[in-house]
């Protein structure tokens, strides 16, 4: 069945991202926030991080391609320390660039291999490799310890889907080969939830033996967890498998419901108690939004006009969760 949006989502805000000659976005690879500001990673053409205020106006950007300190060929991923606002930027050639919350360069850390995702926790820097579905933790002294590795799989890391998911003081991660959600601990990790879905066993077998593309990939698509929520001792999570779904724990069992947040063509990311997706301005329809989010507190775009619609600028769709 379908679960009412207002049982999961408290409010929705549509935030139009303004641009200027230096901060035009081609697309959004990830979104994070700190101290009322939004940080957007754009990997569509020339990798850069752009900082916006609460009104969607650009404040600063980090755009330093090159070979020197603080420079990069591309940005793979980034994460913000929620306590300090420091930004950990995963780059290629393999290194980590550390910025302050104003996007000023602090220092960089060289890496010995390529990684696909990064997250900061109090025990170090978490690094995920999609090549071997492994998680490494880098300590403050630069030493690296592998804390998770699963069986090899025909695995592709979707650049639009999160692997590390921050929820309160916990960090979770998902890797497709195990169809499980894990919680990072001080010493390693533990299974937080294992989930089921239609054609699960066949999908697992197919992914182990071949790279699925086209219609086959659609038929055997596996869930991508986007958001983790806690209600007391119960753990729930939102995932995407063709459509958005929510899996809710009740009396030790998980029950799946469709979640009607259609119209978002791009994967969502979690920051604080907010689940953030984005659309292009020409896809924004206030009437459709009012229908989809009926019963939810809705904050639409002020002074919406044809110029904004035709600009092609991204619009953040910010879901504040009712329980998190």
Regions of interest found by a model, annotated:
Residues 53-55, 100-104, 138-142, 184-188, ...:
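Short loop/turn segments that connect beta-strands within beta-propeller blades
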Residues 27-30, 73-78, 113-121, 155-163, ...:
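Repeated scaffold domains used in trafficking and secretory/extracellular systems
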Residues 192-222, 248-280:
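Conserved blade-ending motifs and adjacent loop-strand segments that build the rim/top face
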Residues 21, 63-71, 110-116, 150-156, ...:
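Short coil/turn segments at the loop-to-beta-strand junctions that recur within blades
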Residues 2-26:
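A short helix->beta-strand "capping" segment at the edge of beta-propeller domains
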Residues 73-75, 90-134, 147-156:
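Asp-box/WD-like beta-propeller blade repeats and closely related beta-sheet repeat scaffolds
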Residues 37-42, 85-91, 124-130, 166-182, ...:
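Short beta-strand elements that form the blades of beta-propeller/WD-repeat-like
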């Amino acid at each position: 069945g379908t679960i009412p949006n207002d049982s999961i989502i408290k409010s929705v805000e549509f935030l139009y991202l303004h641009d200027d000659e230096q901060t035009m976005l081609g697309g959004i690879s990830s979104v994070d926030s700190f101290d009322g500001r939004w940080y957007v990673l754009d990997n569509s053409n020339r990798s850069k991080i752009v900082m916006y205020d609460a009104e969607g106006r650009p404040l600063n950007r980090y755009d330093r391609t090159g070979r020197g300190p603080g420079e990069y060929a591309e940005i793979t991923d980034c994460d913000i320390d929620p306590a300090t606002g420091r930004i950990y930027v995963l780059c290629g050639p393999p290194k980590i660039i550390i910025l302050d919350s104003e996007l000023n360069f602090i220092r960089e850390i060289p890496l010995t291999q390529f990684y696909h995702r990064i997250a900061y926790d109090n025990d170090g820097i978490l690094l995920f490799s999609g090549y071997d579905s492994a998680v490494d933790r880098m300590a403050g002294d630069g030493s690296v310890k592998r804390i998770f590795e699963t069986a090899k799989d025909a695995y592709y890391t979707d650049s639009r889907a999160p692997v590390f998911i921050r929820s309160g003081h916990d960090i979770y991660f998902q890797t497709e080969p195990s169809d499980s959600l894990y919680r990072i601990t001080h010493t390693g990790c533990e299974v937080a939830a294992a989930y089921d879905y239609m054609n699960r066993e066949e999908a697992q077998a197919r992914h182990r033996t071949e790279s699925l593309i086209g219609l086959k990939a659609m038929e055997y698509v596996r869930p991508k967890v986007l958001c983790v929520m806690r209600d007391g001792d119960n753990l729930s999570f939102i995932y995407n498998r063709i459509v958005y779904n929510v899996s809710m724990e009740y009396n030790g069992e998980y029950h799946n419901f469709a979640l009607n947040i259609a119209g978002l063509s791009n994967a969502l990311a979690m920051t604080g108690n907010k689940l953030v997706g984005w659309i292009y301005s020409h896809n924004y329809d206030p009437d459709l939004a009012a229908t989809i989010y009926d019963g939810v507190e809705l904050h639409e775009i002020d002074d919406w006009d044809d110029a904004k619609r035709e600009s092609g600028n991204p619009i953040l769709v910010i879901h504040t969760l009712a329980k998190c």
